[in-house]
């Protein structure tokens, strides 16, 4: 039974040697080889006089173990090389990542500095605008106060002018009424004198006609 297992392991090692590059496959093969050695001891076929036999099972097991050892050494070398490559790659990736982080932190600090500078400039501009607005409001309040005082003084002056104008208008109205009364009296007296003059003229004309009539009548009698 152990002989069949060893033969099968030898064929497997010869046919699938490339698959033993995988540590798991190689470990599985080693377990099978240990199991074959165990069977060999149990069957009592591991005597010392058979170790040197060319076709002895112990010799064949030792040969497989030597090959496995060589594979392990080769695999360890490859693993070390791969480990160095992976380590180098990881170091490069870590260095690149650290550089990227440093560059990003630098950009963020620069952006923060720019933002702080922009905020400071913005605050300065806002304070300047607030100062200008406050000064403008104070100036506007002063102008409004002056205009209010001027308007009040103008109202007082206008009231005085209105009062004086009203007094003058009252005086003028009284004078106009007096003048109107005089004009009316003058018109009445003028109309009377007109009729008187007209009457006198008529009387003179009538007297003249009467005189002419008398003179004519006197001539006719003579």
UniProtKB/Swiss-Prot annotation:
Any one biological process term the GO annotation gives: retrograde vesicle-mediated transport, Golgi to endoplasmic reticulum
Main location: endoplasmic reticulum
Cytoplasmic topological segments: 1-193
Location of the protein in the cell: Endoplasmic reticulum membrane
Keywords noted in UniProt: Endoplasmic reticulum, ER-Golgi transport, Membrane, Protein transport, Transmembrane, Transmembrane helix, Transport
GO cellular component terms attached to this protein's record: endoplasmic reticulum; endoplasmic reticulum membrane; SNARE complex
Protein topology in the membrane: Single-pass type IV membrane protein
Transmembrane stretches, start-end: 194-214
Keyword Repeat: no
Lumenal side: 215-222
Function: SNARE required for targeting and fusion of Golgi-derived retrograde transport vesicles with the ER.
Subunit comment: Component of a SNARE complex consisting of ufe1, use1, sec20 and sec22 or ykt6.
Family of the protein in this entry: Belongs to the USE1 family.
Protein's name according to its UniProt entry: Protein transport protein use1
Protein source organism: Schizosaccharomyces pombe (strain 972 / ATCC 24843)
Organism taxonomic ancestry: Eukaryota, Fungi, Dikarya, Ascomycota, Taphrinomycotina
């Amino acid at each position: 039974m152990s002989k069949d297992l060893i033969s099968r392991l030898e064929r497997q090692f010869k046919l699938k040697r490339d698959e033993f590059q995988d540590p798991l496959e190689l470990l599985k093969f080693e377990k099978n080889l240990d199991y074959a050695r165990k069977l060999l001891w149990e069957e009592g076929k591991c005597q010392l006089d058979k170790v040197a036999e060319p076709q002895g099972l112990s010799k064949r097991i030792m040969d497989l173990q030597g090959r496995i050892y060589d594979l392990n050494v080769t695999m360890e070398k490859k693993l070390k090389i791969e480990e160095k490559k992976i380590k180098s790659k990881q170091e490069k990736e870590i260095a690149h990542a650290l550089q990227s982080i440093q560059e990003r932190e630098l950009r963020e600090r620069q952006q923060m500095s720019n933002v702080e500078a922009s905020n400071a400039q913005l605050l300065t501009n806002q304070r300047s605008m607030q100062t200008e607005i406050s000064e403008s409001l104070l100036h506007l309040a002063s102008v409004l106060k002056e205009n209010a005082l001027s308007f009040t003084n103008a109202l007082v002056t206008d009231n005085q002018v209105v009062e004086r104008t009203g007094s003058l208008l009252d005086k003028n109205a009284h004078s106009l009424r007096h003048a109107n009364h005089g004009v009316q009296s003058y018109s009445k007296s003028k109309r009377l004198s007109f009729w008187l003059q007209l009457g006198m003229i008529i009387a003179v004309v009538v007297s003249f006609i009467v005189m002419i009539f008398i003179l004519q009548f006197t001539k006719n009698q003579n």
